[in-house]
């Protein structure tokens, strides 16, 4: 005995095909976004001197070199919170100010005993609009210049 296709069978088949198409398109979009995002990370190398950093809120360091055109020598990094809260750490919001309204906002966490830490930046204004960065902080090997090494991108 042969069954005739019914409207229910046709609707089920149509739903299965549509579902497969949605999954295929979604998969392709996901793959594209992953490969695009991996292309965005560029290397960031920065040095800064911190003779004006006292550990109090509002202290700052000055950029002495950078491979990023937007981050000019003489730009300042302001630390909003005091060091030592919590004990043994600097954990502070930061503003990277390159002048003329070009600023990036982020956060730095640093172990005071070793000088090792991490800074992340999530956006900005002016030339730093859409700026994202993740940098490893290392203490001065020359007694003066702190180092940021990591990656950056612009949305």
Residue ranges of each PLM-predicted region?
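Beta-strand-enriched cores of mature, soluble protein domains
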Residues: 30-155
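A detector of low-complexity, intrinsically disordered, Ser/Thr/Gly/Pro/Ala-rich segments
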Residues: 4-7, 22, 45, 60-62
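Bacterial N-terminal signal peptides
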Residues: 13-26
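Bacterial N-terminal signal peptides that target proteins for export
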Residues: 2-14
